[in-house]
Swiss-Prot record:
Bilayer-crossing regions: 25-45, 54-74, 92-112, 129-149, 170-190, 194-214
Gene behind this protein: Cyb561d1
Swiss-Prot/TrEMBL cofactor(s): heme b
Organism: Mus musculus (Mouse)
InterPro entries linked to this entry: CYB561D1/2, Cyt_b561/ferric_Rdtase_TM
Transmembrane is among the record's keywords: yes
Name of this chain's protein: Probable transmembrane reductase CYB561D1
Cofactor note: Binds 2 heme b groups non-covalently.
Length: 229
């Protein structure tokens, strides 16, 4: 009869160096795409030529850059601030999300003003409807994050459960923002400037950071939180 040792946990298999570098490379690429795509939309919009021209600029800053970077802050492999403490990264996360909300509000204001000046109807496309829902969900996420920042003042009793909700809903909000961006590429404004193969390339660019963020949250954080609860 073989003796069995109780309480021992087998050591996890060491990750191959190539796999580790590929994971890091995917994170770097996500940062570059988030920044590059934002710059691309800014140049394409030619800000200042009209009220509408500011709408894609601020929305790209809000969701393609600020929100993406605020989420990637917590990645152990993809964060640009991996050397900072968790407390510092939480503050940076709040700064990034605050910037995202401010830019989103400005983008919303410009599109409303443009519609009013042009005497055009509001909320007549899937892009506008999903975008409006994304803005509402972003506001809800901000309130949830505020409760986590000050749990005693908000009288939160189950912080771990609220963190899980915040993580899950945050991923949903970012995916909603990605869908809104993709729907914007079907607009007359975008298709009049970008056509053919370039249009399909642009359609795929926002999906890459979304996949990286989805993998980050689902594989490295959510399982642990479920165990804690």
């Amino acid at each position: 009869m073989h003796s069995m040792e109780v309480g021992l946990v087998p050591a996890p298999a060491r990750e191959p160096r190539l796999t580790r570098w590929l994971r890091r490379g995917s994170g770097i690429l996500a940062h570059l795409i988030a920044l590059g795509f934002t710059i691309f939309l800014t140049v394409l919009s030619r800000p200042g030529t009209s009220l509408f021209s500011w709408h894609p600029v601020f929305m790209a800053l809000a969701f393609c850059l600020c929100m993406a970077e605020a989420i990637l802050l917590f990645s152990p492999e993809h964060s640009l601030f991996f050397f900072c403490s968790r407390k510092t990264r939480i503050r940076l996360h709040w700064a990034g999300q605050t910037m995202a909300i401010l830019c989103a509000v400005l983008g919303l204001g410009f599109i409303i003003s443009s519609k009013i000046r042009s005497e055009m109807s509001h909320l007549v496309s899937w892009h506008s409807w999903i975008g409006a829902l994304t803005l509402l969900a972003t506001g809800g996420q901000a309130l949830c994050g505020l409760c986590l920042l000050c749990p005693r003042a908000a009288r939160v009793s189950r912080v771990a459960r609220l963190k899980l909700y915040h993580l899950t809903c945050g991923l949903v909000v970012y995916l909603m923002a990605t869908v809104t961006v993709l729907l914007g590429m079907y607009s007359v404004w975008f298709q009049a400037q970008i056509k053919g193969t370039a249009w399909y390339l642009c359609l795929g660019l926002p999906l890459y950071p979304a996949l990286v963020i989805m993998h980050q949250i689902s594989s490295s954080y959510l399982p642990r939180k479920k165990v804690e609860i």
